[in-house]
């Protein structure tokens, strides 16, 4: 057997405390306790509807854990590009394409709410302004952390970079697969 570690899930587990939303954040996003509790109640109902016993030892905390995981995985709805970029736009005299390759992303398909994941490479031709390379990856992550399709994800990232940088051109290549 081959095992592949999903770093994203490991990070999600690390960022998500056992207590409901202590400190009001889940994965660096502000979330109300009521939202977590309401989502958890829906997960509990779903678990019952599929025929499981929510009082079973292994499932006692599952609704709350699943609610926190969903909130973390959809944190892109509570983020904005302005906060991500945080003024990290710099003047640049060059005119050669800047490329950020193989940015890993994880998202949920909007059709079945099942995970999909992949890599996206972004290139842009600057027109006097550049952005830190890590910010490009964070912008990808923000849009990926929403219910998505890969075509829209790609378009949103390119459109946002164009808006931020007024680049001469932006291009992306995205490959993804569903679970």
Feature annotation, model-predicted:
Residues 1-3:
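Aromatic (phenylalanine/tyrosine) cluster motif
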Residues 6-179:
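A domain-level signal for the structural core that forms small-molecule/cofactor-binding pockets
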């Amino acid at each position: 057997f081959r095992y592949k570690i999903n770093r994203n899930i490991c990070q999600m587990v690390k960022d998500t405390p056992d207590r409901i939303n202590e400190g009001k954040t889940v994965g660096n996003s502000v979330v109300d306790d009521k939202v977590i509790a309401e989502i958890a109640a829906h997960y509990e109902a779903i678990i019952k509807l599929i025929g499981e016993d929510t009082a079973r030892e292994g499932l006692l905390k599952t609704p709350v854990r699943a609610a926190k995981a969903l909130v973390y995985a959809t944190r892109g709805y509570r983020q904005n590009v302005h906060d991500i970029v945080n003024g990290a736009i710099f003047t640049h005299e060059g005119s050669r394409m800047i490329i950020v390759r193989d940015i890993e992303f994880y998202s949920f398909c909007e059709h079945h709410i099942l995970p999909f994941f992949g890599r996206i490479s972004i290139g842009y031709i600057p027109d006097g302004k550049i952005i830190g390379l890590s910010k490009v990856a964070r912008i990808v992550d923000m849009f990926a952390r929403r219910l998505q399709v890969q075509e829209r994800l790609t378009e949103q990232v390119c459109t946002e970079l164009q808006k931020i940088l007024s680049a001469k051109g932006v291009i992306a290549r995205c490959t993804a697969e569903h679970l």
